[in-house]
Swiss-Prot record:
Catalytic activity: L-seryl-[protein] + ATP = 3-O-(5'-adenylyl)-L-seryl-[protein] + diphosphate; L-threonyl-[protein] + ATP = 3-O-(5'-adenylyl)-L-threonyl-[protein] + diphosphate; L-tyrosyl-[protein] + ATP = O-(5'-adenylyl)-L-tyrosyl-[protein] + diphosphate; L-histidyl-[protein] + UTP = N(tele)-(5'-uridylyl)-L-histidyl-[protein] + diphosphate
Entry keyword Transcription regulation: no
Origin species: Tolumonas auensis (strain DSM 9187 / NBRC 110442 / TA 4)
Cofactor field: Mg(2+); Mn(2+)
Gene label: ydiU
Role of this protein: Nucleotidyltransferase involved in the post-translational modification of proteins. It can catalyze the addition of adenosine monophosphate (AMP) or uridine monophosphate (UMP) to a protein, resulting in modifications known as AMPylation and UMPylation.
Residues binding Mg(2+): 272, 281
EC number(s) stated in the UniProt entry for this protein: 2.7.7.-, 2.7.7.108
Active-site annotation: 271 (proton acceptor)
Residues holding ATP: 101, 103-104, 123, 135-136, 193, 200, 281
Annotated Pfam families: SelO
Keyword ATP-binding attributed: yes
This protein's name: Protein nucleotidyltransferase YdiU
Top-level EC class: transferase
Length: 519
């Protein structure tokens, strides 16, 4: 086995929990607790990511060795690993929830390879002091979704945590999938997720809310030093402000990327916001099928729609304001925090305009384009048009003689296609004139559009089909779907089934259109 260089700075440099009592409790004056993953009876590695293994300097053959399977299942540790769970708080659905923490995530350590730092974290490896009423476990259903989505997002070009492995534990876990009083046993599983840092907004909020100023100052300085080393040259008087602005900028860019691919996170609580601007915590997420700004995959949010597709940027801004409030308890220059929020607004507006221009095949965004785009969004929503298919097919339109039938298979209902055909035809005419005004060659326009409009996304029903197969003991579809998702912008021969709009049977099927936080 290759030598592994672990450098566990988080637990070496930040205060830890002096108690070793591994049961749910309040933890004060500490950012982490030492924990031991719970052993599992029959660990089986059923999926892995070659790209993530390469980041860590590990081969897939090594991952399959007993020592690695033991480490990835919580049954053993490799030299240098020192498992811990972290303490943080957060706002959940707009309300302060107090201490939350890693309730079933256990970090194994920080691995250094090619001068890059990667924290390895097991999700579903047992109880920690932050588990509250949970069992610290995860089921196969949610673990497959996290594994696939982590890698799908990366290949789409969306900032994200990664997934190294998916291990079946051999356990049966009780879960009430829709919190309706009908619990069932499901297979247990563990995902090893990987990121340069798993620090969240909530890590800063909890000490601020508790008045632990020294602790908060330590975390701010540690985060800048470890995770933002390029800011070390900044004068100490402005370093924190520049850092917060960078957090605001990366968060704004993330929201634009989510919008571009039609991703809905489902539970954008402040404890689910990465300080690095990564997509983190894949729970009741979903991909937009028929375009709907009010759509949420999360049953818990079905009435309030707080975290629906169209509100994600505003929620990200709200979350940044809560982070600014926390930082403001130890940063006297509140104006510089306000500047960070302004940077979010400016960055989001600029990046959103550039992204929409790219999706529509324009070389640049013009102020008058807003009217054309808003009209398109209205039509897409009213006519129940598949977002992914529509934008991909739009590149095929001959703008010198626009024909709506090129886009017909993106519509879910023939009656709505007929009803909205005149309005769509008029929009397509206006769109074509806008494209022609730039004088771009058709092939050049199509190539540019195809770089940002994917053919393949992790549609909810595709994930559910893989889950159904895995629960019957067939794990090959996981690898097959992952292989397709590795090249989301390239038409792949024989893979047409992965590029179809949602079938009728999946419209209201649990796991395809409705999800919960149960995992």
């Amino acid at each position: 086995m290759a030598f592994l260089h672990f450098d566990n700075r988080f637990i070496r440099e930040l205060p830890g929990d002096p108690l070793t009592l591994n049961q749910p409790r309040q933890v004060h004056a500490a950012f982490w607790s030492a924990v031991t993953p719970a052993p599992v009876p029959q660990p089986q590695l059923i999926a892995s990511s070659a790209e993530v293994a390469a980041l860590l300097g590990i081969s897939l053959a090594e991952l399959q060795q007993p020592a690695w399977v033991a480490a990835l299942s919580g049954n053993g540790l490799l030299d240098g690993m020192s498992p811990f769970a972290t303490c943080y708080g957060g706002h959940q659905f707009g309300n302060w929830a107090g201490q939350l923490g890693d309730g079933r995530a256990i970090s194994l350590g920080e691995l250094i390879h090619n001068d890059l730092r990667w924290e390895l974290q097991l999700k579903g490896a047992g109880v920690t002091p932050y588990s509250r009423r949970g069992d610290g476990k995860a089921v196969l259903r949610s673990s497959i979704r996290e594994f696939l989505c982590s890698e799908a997002m990366f290949h789409l070009g969306v900032p994200t945590t990664r997934a190294l492995s998916l291990v079946l534990t051999g356990e049966q876990i009780w879960r009430d999938m829709f919190y309706d009083g009908n619990p069932q046993q499901e297979p247990g599983a563990i995902v090893c997720r990987v990121a340069p840092s798993f620090i969240r907004f909530g890590h800063f909020q909890l000490p601020a809310m508790r008045g632990e100023s020294d602790l908060l100052n330590q975390l701010i300085d540690f985060t800048i030093d470890r995770d933002f080393p390029h800011l070390s040259a900044q004068p100490a008087t402005v370093r924190r402000g520049v850092w917060f602005s960078e957090v605001c900028i990366t968060t704004a860019k993330l929201m634009v990327e989510w919008t571009r691919v039609g991703f809905v996170h489902g539970v954008m609580n402040t404890d689910n916001m990465s300080i690095l601007g990564l997509t983190i915590d894949y729970g009741p997420y979903g991909w937009v099928d028929n375009f709907d700004l009010n759509w949420t995959p999360n049953t818990t949010d079905a009435e309030g729609l707080r975290y629906c597709f169209g509100r994600q940027p505003a929620i990200a801004r709200w979350n940044l304001e809560r982070l600014a409030e926390a930082l403001g308890t130890v940063m006297t220059d509140h104006a510089i925090l306000a500047q960070g929020i302004e940077m979010f607004d400016e960055t989001f507006a600029q990046e959103m305009a550039a992204m929409l221009a790219a999706k529509l095949g324009w070389q640049q965004w013009l102020p008058e384009d807003s009217e054309l785009v808003n009209r398109l969004f209205d039509l897409l929503q009213q006519a129940e048009v598949d977002m992914t298919l529509f934008f991909r097919r739009l590149a095929l339109v001959d703008v010198s003689a626009p024909d709506l039938t090129v886009l017909a298979d993106a519509f879910y209902r023939d009656d709505l296609f007929c009803q909205h055909q005149p309005a769509f035809t008029q929009w397509l005419t206006n769109y074509s004139q806008r494209v022609l005004s730039e004088g771009v060659l058709p092939a050049e326009r199509a190539a540019r559009m195809n770089q940002v409009n994917p053919v393949y996304v992790l549609r909810n029903y595709l994930a559910q089909q893989v889950i159904d197969a895995a629960e019957q003991g067939n794990y090959q579809p996981i690898a097959e779907l992952l292989e397709v998702l590795r090249q989301p912008y390239t038409e792949q021969s024989g893979k047409e089934a992965y590029a179809q709009k949602r079938p009728d049977w999946a419209r209201h099927k649990p796991g395809c259109s409705m999800l919960s936080c149960s995992s």
